[in-house]
Amino acid sequence: MMQRRSPPKHRHDGTSPLPLGMDWSPPPRKWNGRDTVWPHDPRTGWSYCVTIPSWIVLPKSRNSDPVVFYRVQVSVQSPEGITTMRGVLRRFNDFLKLLTDLKRTFPRKGFPSAPPKGLLRMKSRAVLEERRCSLEEWITKLLSDIELARSVVVASFLELEAAARSACQDVDQNASDSNNDRSSTSSSPMVHPSLSLFHAGGSTLTSDYGSDTAYETSEVGSPSVGQDDISEIGTEDLTLDEDLTLTNPIEKLVNFSMSNIDEGLSMSETILEQLEDFPKHKVRSRYVNNILGKDVYNGNASKGVFLANNGSRLLSEPEPSTHSVMHDRNDSAERFALHTGQTSTSGLLISSRDSHLDLRQGPGVSLGTGLVCNPERQGSAQIVLPLELRNKLNRILLATNERLVNAKTDMEDLIARLNQEIAVKDYLNKKVNDLEGELETTKQRSKENLEQAIMSERERFNQMQWDMEELRQKSYEMEMKLKSREDGSSHAEPTVQSTISEKHVLSKELDARKQQLEDLSRRYEELEAKSKADMKVLVKEVKSLRRSHVELEKELTHSLTDKTNAEKLLQEERKLLENTVAARKKLLSDCRILHDRLKEYNLNLSMDGNGNFVDDSTTISDVLRLLSISDDQIEEAQLLSGFDENAAAEDIDKTLSMDTETRIMEDELRKILANIFVENAKLRKQVNSAMLRALQKDVKTTEDVNEENSDEKDEASRETLKR
């Protein structure tokens, strides 16, 4: 027993069981006939898409009501980028039957809900157009599942085999037109007589989704074909669109014979059974694209004809007990794969140069025509590739990998955005829950207030009723007294007069009570109307309170943010003031230090009456030493003042947020003080240098005097010696 295969994960991976190995693709946004650009690379393989562009109303018979049919357009794109279209008419019930069959075939899958059926007695254009759009959206969601898009039920519903045949015929016509010059040098093509025309024999087959009159036996025995894919409609009343009408008789014959998968299977099996008498050791090269292998999913049989890029044709003949499943996966008509299962008979490859080679049962055979057969699985699959197309295949694989990487990055971005949206949604849900809770509390409070008001009004109403009952009882008693007094005939005239007066008083009292009762009833009505008005006012107030509550919350949050900002600004201002005070204190201390240091630079020198310096110290050398020390201290003070200026500049940079005027004043003060100290130091250095020059001059004069005295002494001694 064979193991069940896992569901496919990628499109165009070479495992599609559909004709030509095609896979579903989203429809293009803009249609341009044969040169339509699809939203994927066409070199990956055959692709098909499904759209529902229009609908048509046709009568079921001459005297019956019209029936709405939806035109299902199946577009097929070849690896060369050529687009072909084929239309199929389906009723709304056919779509529902498709969903039922898919649920029966895939019981564990989840399916998108079909559009509601409803009643379309009044077939307005708006309703029909809305249903057409919903059907197109629904079938797009359905086919986005790769496993459903490759299923037999969908292929039968869309008649993919007939669409594949028409696409292959269109591609072959273009290939034959472009290769006329090349094919003129080759030998004349030979076709087996059984491939010239298709003749249907035996019983006719009908599609579950198509018309009941797809094949009707004519008087001469050949199948007469009704209108294409119109279920439950007479052939004499239906006329399809102009783009569905085929002008070529052979195309009509092929489409009529292959209008659905079951009929295509029986026809292909009949034709391939006739091919058993055809010689298998030698075949002329020719494209035979009007016959395609039909896959049988229950494992009965599968035979086919596959064509290569250079005009070679590969025929496979499996054993009667074992059948192979073959699919054509052309990558720009340059590669194809042959999938076989437990085959024991070797295939036959015939090139377009009339070279004849046999493929044996080995794992692979190298061919002299430039084709290499590389086995991927022993005895189960073979891949035939031209040598010159390996580089192109590598480029295609690299491009595919780049697209996969880009798709992965896009998916990660989408996941990140989705996570952000989920977080925002959670936050909004929390906010909504909080608001709902507040709303519930407000509702409860208003409800309690209303109940209290109603209870108080009820109590007042009950009290009023009790008062009315008491008044009625009193009036009844008074009437009884009056009657008893009127009935008493034994009373005297004064008593009669008194009773008349009492009766008059009682009648007045009764009128007063009645007036009071009317007033109370009127007051009750007014209170009831007032209570209703109060209830309306309370409802309005509750609504206004809800709105004001939301606004107050917003104002509260805004005020809290303003408060935090103000506190931050206040803290910064306090820090700036502290820094300012510290900087000023430091400035004063630095000024004191500089002033004290400059005071120490005074020399204890004095001058005599002739203007010469008199040194208090013992020797002139001490004076010179003091002057040098004074110069060094002045230079050190200048460096210290420069350092203080730099430190002050740094403090100013730190307090950027201070007032502009205060900062400018402090900068000017620092500069003025620094200039004063610098000028003072310069003057003190000049004084020291003058004093130094004066001292040096005095020293030189004393030395000259001593030398003159010594010279005079020497001359005197010489003169004495001469004498």
Swiss-Prot record:
Q: Which InterPro entries match?
A: EREX-like, PX_dom, PX_dom_sf
Name any GO cellular component annotation.
endosome membrane
What are the residue boundaries of the PX domain, all occurrences included? 48-165
Skewed-composition ranges (Basic residues): 1-12
| Keyword Protein transport in record | yes
Spans annotated as Disordered: 1-26, 169-193, 209-230, 698-723
Which keywords does this chain's UniProt record carry? Answer: Coiled coil, Cytoplasm, Endosome, Lipid-binding, Membrane, Protein transport, Transport
Compositional bias of kind Polar residues: 209-225
- Name any Gene Ontology BP term: protein transport
Gene null: resulting phenotype = No visible phenotype under normal growth conditions, but the double mutant plants erex and erel1 exhibit severe growth retardation at a juvenile stage.
Please list the residue ranges that the record marks as compositionally biased, kind Acidic residues.
Answer: 704-714
Where composition is biased (Low complexity), the residues are 172-193
| PANTHER family according to UniProt | PX DOMAIN-CONTAINING PROTEIN EREL1-RELATED (PTHR46856:SF1)
Q: State the protein's name.
A: PX domain-containing protein EREL1
What organism does this protein naturally occur in? Arabidopsis thaliana
Gene coding for it: EREL1
